[in-house]
Amino acid sequence: MLYFLYKILNINILNYITVRAGIAFFAAFFLTAFFMPRFIAWAKNKHANQPIYELAPQSHKAKNKTPTMGGIVFITATLLSSLLCSNLTNTFVIGGILCLFGFSFIGFKDDYGKIAGHSNHAGMSPRKKFMYQIGLSFALSIILFLFANLSGEFFIPFYKYALFNLQFFAIFFWMLVITASSNSVNLTDGLDGLASIPSIFALVSLGIFVYLCGHSVFSAYLFLPKVVGVGELCVVIFALIGAILGFLWYNCYPAQVFMGDSGSLSVGAFIGYTGVVSKNEILLIIIGFVFVIETLSVILQVGSFKIRKKRIFLMAPIHHHFELKGWNENKIIVRFWIIALIANIIALTTLKLR
C-alpha cells in the first residue's frame, strides 16, 4: 500500500526500500507486542497448552501449562506489515509471503492436532508433514525459477564466481534447502527464546545480502551475484525481524508463550527461501550454524542408534544433552546465542573476503 502511495501521490521517500523496511519492522513489532498478551489470555482460557514430550528433561514438566501457537500472531503481524509496506507486484515478495503463510499453516495443523489430542504425538505424522513441506518448497522453487527468473548459478562462500549452473536441477536443490531450513529451526525451538535470537541474527545477515544483491552498484563493487528486484524482499525480512522481537518479549525465560510449529516451520522456511534468492544456499550453513548443529545432533543420534545401538548424546537435539548434563537453561540459551552471533559475523566477512 505504501509503495503505491509513492506511485500515486509521488511521495518520494516511500520509494526507498530502507524506509519501508523500517516502517514494516516497527509495525510488525507493535502489532505482535499488542496482540500477543491477548492471544496468551485466550489460549489459556481454551487450554491451548504445549503438550510436553514424556521423555523430556524434568525441568520441562513445569511448562505444560504454557500456551503454544504464538507463531500465528507474529506471522500474521509479519504478513500484515508486509502487505502494508512492500511492492506486491514483486515476485520475490509474493514468494516470501506465500512461504510464510504456507509453512505457518502446516505448522498450525500440526500444533492443533497436538493440542486437541493432548499429546506431542497427536499432530501430523512426520511423513505427512514432510510431504507438505516438500510440496510447498517445490511450488516456491518453481515460482522462483519460472516467474522470478532466478538463476541456477551455484556459489560458495569466499569465492566471487559461480562454480557452475544447476539449470533446471536448481529447482530440486532449492526445494531441499527450504525444507531442511524449516525443519532445522523447528528442531532448535526447544528452550525459551533459543530459536528466536539465532533467527534474528540470520535474518539480519540475509537482509544485508539481499539488499546488496539487489543493488546494481553494491553488488558489482562486492562481486556479489546481481539479482534484479530481490532487494524489495528486505521489507518482508525486517517485518519478520520486528515480529520475532515482539514475540521474544513474551517468550524469553520463563516463557509465557511458545511459537509452536506454526512459528518455527515458517521462520525456518523463510530463512531458507531468503538464502536461495540471495544465492547464499551454502553460506546458510554458517549463517544458521546453531540450527545446523542441532539438526546434525539429531541425525547422528538416530544414525548411531540404528547402526550401533548406542546413543552419542544423552538426548537430542543437543540442547537437551546439555540440560541433562546439568547446565542451567539460561546458560544454554545465551551460549547458543553467542555462537550464532559469532557465526553470523563470520558470514558477513564473506562480503569482502572473496
Swiss-Prot record:
Catalytic activity: UDP-N-acetyl-alpha-D-muramoyl-L-alanyl-gamma-D-glutamyl-meso-2,6-diaminopimeloyl-D-alanyl-D-alanine + di-trans,octa-cis-undecaprenyl phosphate = di-trans,octa-cis-undecaprenyl diphospho-N-acetyl-alpha-D-muramoyl-L-alanyl-D-glutamyl-meso-2,6-diaminopimeloyl-D-alanyl-D-alanine + UMP
Localization annotation: Cell inner membrane
Cysteines engaged in disulfide bonds, as pairs: none
Cofactor: Mg(2+)
Pfam families (UniProt xref): Glycos_transf_4, MraY_sig1
InterPro entries noted in UniProt: Glycosyl_transferase_4 (IPR000715), PNAcMuramoyl-5peptid_Trfase (IPR003524), PNAcMuramoyl-5peptid_Trfase_CS (IPR018480)
CC annotations in GO: plasma membrane
Membrane topology per record: Multi-pass membrane protein
Regions crossing the membrane: 23-43, 66-86, 88-108, 138-158, 161-181, 193-213, 227-247, 257-277, 282-302, 331-351
CDD domains: GT_MraY
EC number: 2.7.8.13
GO BP: cell division; cell wall organization; peptidoglycan biosynthetic process; regulation of cell shape
UniProt keyword list: Cell cycle, Cell division, Cell inner membrane, Cell membrane, Cell shape, Cell wall biogenesis/degradation, Magnesium, Membrane, Metal-binding, Peptidoglycan synthesis, Transferase, Transmembrane, Transmembrane helix
Protein's UniProt keywords contain Magnesium: yes
GO molecular function, one term: UDP-N-acetylmuramoyl-L-alanyl-D-glutamyl-meso-2,6-diaminopimelyl-D-alanyl-D-alanine:undecaprenyl-phosphate transferase activity
UniProt main location, coarse: membrane
Pathway terms, separated by semicolons: Cell wall biogenesis; peptidoglycan biosynthesis
Assigned protein family: Belongs to the glycosyltransferase 4 family. MraY subfamily.
Function: Catalyzes the initial step of the lipid cycle reactions in the biosynthesis of the cell wall peptidoglycan: transfers peptidoglycan precursor phospho-MurNAc-pentapeptide from UDP-MurNAc-pentapeptide onto the lipid carrier undecaprenyl phosphate, yielding undecaprenyl-pyrophosphoryl-MurNAc-pentapeptide, known as lipid I.
HAMAP family in the cross-refs: MraY (MF_00038)
The name this protein goes by in its record: Phospho-N-acetylmuramoyl-pentapeptide-transferase
UniProt source species: Campylobacter hominis (strain ATCC BAA-381 / DSM 21671 / CCUG 45161 / LMG 19568 / NCTC 13146 / CH001A)
